[in-house]
């Protein structure tokens, strides 16, 4: 039980996919201008990452490995992720049309979010079992959502601040992301995996 908790904390804080592994930077920079859209994207990504992590584990364990076709791993994981994203898009469209409009193009772009594929591939390379795959996928999603929401809140405050003209826009956003990354480095000694 302790190793599962350490895996979760390690994935959320110590080995954060955005700030440490640099995966998922496109939605991190693209959706983080408004807090509302960042929360929606975080929830959608949490659902997709967790479900895709489970599905990719099942595909790897029960289809690819027994048939000896591990060389199709990346292509099959992309297919699994695309199916999960389409399912998520249908659910969001039916349950919250306003969130569906706010997320716009970024919801289908979860398919190409490298963090989702990265979690699926890292689950296989790190030999996680079924429960560890769920925890790893959920932890990566929570870490992504946490960083996205924090960054979005900071960007809203920075937008209202008096920022020098050369630093407005992407420049100050990159500086802020770098400072967040430094802050998350403080968690480095927290969990040894």
UniProtKB/Swiss-Prot annotation:
Protein known as: Ion-translocating oxidoreductase complex subunit A
State whether it acts alone or in a complex, and with which partners, per the record: The complex is composed of six subunits: RnfA, RnfB, RnfC, RnfD, RnfE and RnfG.
A Pfam family cross-referenced in the UniProt record is Rnf-Nqr
User: GO:BP terms for this protein?
Assistant: electron transport chain
**Source domain of life:** Bacteria
Task: Please report the record's description of how this protein sits within the membrane.
Answer: Multi-pass membrane protein
Its chief place of residence is membrane
Tell me where in or outside the cell this protein is found.
Cell inner membrane
EC id: 7.-.-.-
Annotated keywords = Cell inner membrane, Cell membrane, Electron transport, Membrane, Translocase, Transmembrane, Transmembrane helix, Transport
Under the cellular component aspect of Gene Ontology, which terms does the record hold? Answer: plasma membrane
The organism encoding this protein is Aliivibrio fischeri (strain ATCC 700601 / ES114) (Vibrio fischeri)
In terms of InterPro entries, this protein maps to: Ion_transpt_RnfA/RsxA, NqrDE/RnfAE, NqrDE/RnfAE_oxidrdctase
Q: What's the stated role of this polypeptide?
A: Part of a membrane-bound complex that couples electron transfer with translocation of ions across the membrane.
Q: What class of enzyme is it?
A: translocase
Record field: transmembrane: 5-25, 39-59, 67-87, 102-122, 134-154, 171-191
* UniProt gene name: rnfA
- Protein family (similarity comment): Belongs to the NqrDE/RnfAE family.
